[in-house]
Amino acid sequence: MAYPQLTDKPGALETAAAIRSGALSVAEAVDAAIVRLEKLDGPINALAVPDFARAAATAKAMDAGGPDPDKPLWGVPMTVKESFEVEGLPSCWGHEKLKNYI
């Protein structure tokens, strides 16, 4: 089954293939995702807790190690819902009482 292309931007599968082939680095993919988020997220405020510095550092480390063929989406940028606990980031689940829970 083919997946419909909803935008002119490459999806996760295309991005993963470009990273595996060496046509795109993880750092380039992350940088592009950050630029797009900074440009488009303002009015909708979908990104509750940006962690761009850690994303960029992780991308550099991943590029230094090379692709993992056993992980099909290796290196593809993604976001994590703030209700999942991530070390060093708040997880308030949208509740004001939990705004300082880290």
Spans of model-derived segments:
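Histidine-rich, glycine-flanked metal-binding segment
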Residues: 50-71
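Short, functionally important structural connectors and interaction interfaces within domains
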Residues: 16, 36-39, 65, 81, ...
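An N-terminal boundary/leader segment
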Residues: 1-57
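Alpha-helix boundary/interfacial micro-motifs
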Residues: 39, 58, 68, 92, ...
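Flexible N-terminal pre-Rossmann segment of NAD(P)-dependent oxidoreductases
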Residues: 4-10, 65-76
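Broad hydrophobic/π-residue packing in well-ordered secondary structure
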Residues: 33-34, 47, 66-67, 98-101
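Enzymes and membrane/adaptor proteins characterized by extended Gly/Ser/Thr/Asp/Glu-rich
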Residues: 72-102
